[in-house]
Design a protein with these regions (language model features):
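C-terminal nucleotide
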Residues: 2-14, 18-21, 28-88, 101-105, ...
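Conserved phosphate-donor
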Residues: 93-95
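Short loop/turn motifs enriched for small/polar and acidic residues
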Residues: 97-99
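DPxDG-like acidic metal-binding loop motif
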Residues: 109-131
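Alpha-helical scaffolds flanking conserved acidic
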Residues: 135-137
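Glycine-rich active-site/cofactor-binding loop and its immediate structural neighborhood
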Residues: 303-305
């Protein structure tokens, strides 16, 4: 028996930081750069990363290993579900292949942690033929990350599961203890994932700065301002900007939304004294603006990636490279409606 699972990478188009709060929308693009896993029957649990040849073999799921923690957590959650359902299960071998890293092994900031969890859950769903729908697989991903005390918007998990371009809003906090089956069958207040269909063509360029950034630490830093009156006003403004972008009927209004959200992030920087738009990201945006585009940091900022949209195709890769910015060839991942 063999099955494959794919977890798509992600790029935030708009809504970052605000989206960690329930009911605040984000627009997220799932990338065709992804993590693929192949799952096969085995006498022992075996995890293999073909990119760096790392490998671990173990007999039960109580194993602890920092490098493999996201995969092991996803396995644990899925096998608990199998147990609740009374399904027969066995140990498996999982081979991992990723194109979310650079050639020298550095992460590109495309959500590899979320992508690997989604790939495992999708692959196990096919392997054990549970026929779970997309929202149930998303919930399993969230539960597995919750077990690791990972906090955030979980928008990367939604993109990794669904593909396409999505509108996403985070759920209100849910008690993750108890029956997994019950959690899958319970409505999570304010959780929303839906595909966006724009009536105009999108052209974009993605630049990787080569500077790593820690999303968790940056989100935690901003969260300390939750009771600040100016921050609350910014959250309301974020919701307005993103909803207007979601409803865009032409490319110009969409590009204006990108500019507005860049300004929003700049205001957040001033309020929190956190560097989101680094000098390289600023350089990327300036180059794109000169070619009639609208750009911004994507995700937590402070490094990683920036994204810009244009009313027409552009050829600026050589210019970006001359500034030390690596252009990434990225298409939108296919939709996975289940």
């Amino acid at each position: 028996m063999k099955a494959e699972g794919i977890g798509w990478g992600k790029l935030f188009v708009a809504g970052e930081y605000a989206v960690v709060h329930p009911g605040h929308p984000a627009i997220i693009l799932a990338t065709n750069r992804c993590i693929r896993v192949t799952i096969e029957t085995s006498n022992q649990f075996c995890l293999i990363n073909t990119n760096n040849q790392k490998k671990i073999v173990f007999d039960d799921l109580n194993v602890r290993d920092e490098y493999w923690k996201f995969l092991i957590a996803a396995l644990n959650v899925f096998y608990r579900l199998l147990q609740e359902k009374g399904c027969r299960f066995s140990s498996v071998s999982i081979t991992v292949n990723s194109d979310l890293d650079s050639e020298d092994g550095r992460k590109l900031g495309l959500g590899s942690s979320g992508a690997i969890v989604a790939a495992i859950i999708k692959g196990l769903n096919r392997f054990y033929q549970l026929n779970l729908n997309s929202i149930s697989m998303f919930k399993l991903c969230v539960i597995s990350q919750s077990d690791l005390k990972v906090q955030g918007s979980y928008g990367d998990l939604a993109a990794a599961i669904y593909g396409g371009i999505i509108q996403y809003t985070r759920f209100e906090d849910v008690d993750m203890t108890g029956s997994i089956s019950a959690l899958l069958n319970t409505e999570w207040p304010q959780l929303s994932v839906s595909y966006l269909n724009y009536p105009f063509d999108l052209h974009w360029v993605v630049g990787w700065t080569g500077e790593p950034a820690s999303t968790q630490r940056r989100v935690d830093w901003v969260h300390a301002f939750i009771e600040n009156e100016k921050y609350i006003q910014l959250l309301d403004l974020s919701k307005k900007i993103v909803y207007e972008m979601i409803q865009s009927h032409d490319i110009e209004s969409f590009l204006n939304g990108i500019r507005q959200y860049r300004d929003w992030l700049n205001q957040l920087e001033i309020l929190t004294d956190l560097t989101i738009e680094t000098s390289q990201i600023k350089s990327f945006i300036e180059i794109c603006t000169q070619h009639h585009g609208s750009g911004k940091s994507s995700g937590a900022g402070g490094g990683d990636c920036a994204i810009a949209f244009f009313p027409h195709p552009v050829a600026i890769n050589d210019i970006l490279l001359s500034k030390g910015i690596m252009p990434l060839t990225i298409q939108i991942a296919k939709r996975e409606v289940v």
